């Protein structure tokens, strides 16, 4: 599997709760849609940014694990900043206007036990806020940090987001999934690049 964010293999299914097609994003995935597809993901310490151009009613979501990579891995942007650039660039390619893009951000819970100093969830939350501020993209809603994992559904056509905080019973499962993806990414070769659009 490619270590860079991807839109391939995004699982789509009929969501019974919302009676619509949903696309479930896993860590390292992102997707942009211009229809009624619900974008959904489950977050622990990871962060998902939901971006939207309200005029075109197009939006997208990413799911990243870390704000940045190790300085020595040759690709510090393959995590948070890479995820954000890919999502923004894909929206711009589809006609979104940078000055109209707005953000809703979620996740960054501190679910990994034993990480009390500079926890990854807090770092992810700080990163996404600072990144969007630097890009002049307003955050119009957020649910970041805390101790509970979350499941979110984002409806790009309306901008609606539904957040379900998961009980403590799910923490171990979410933390194990995130840890496994981190381990896989740390061993994967660095590939790909980012093309910036203004």
Swiss-Prot record:
In alphabetical order, the GO MF annotations are:
protein-glutamine glutaminase activity
| Reactions that this protein is recorded to catalyse | L-glutaminyl-[protein] + H2O = L-glutamyl-[protein] + NH4(+)
UniProt keyword terms in alphabetical order: Chemotaxis, Hydrolase
Q: What is its EC number?
A: 3.5.1.44
Q: What top-level class of enzyme does the UniProt entry assign?
A: hydrolase
Positions in coiled-coil regions: none
A GO BP term here is: chemotaxis
Family the entry assigns: Belongs to the CheD family.
Q: What does this protein do?
A: Probably deamidates glutamine residues to glutamate on methyl-accepting chemotaxis receptors (MCPs), playing an important role in chemotaxis.
Q: Which NCBIfam families match?
A: PRK13487.1 (NF010013)
Q: Protein name, please?
A: Probable chemoreceptor glutamine deamidase CheD
Cite the source lineage: Bacteria, Pseudomonadati, Pseudomonadota, Gammaproteobacteria, Lysobacterales
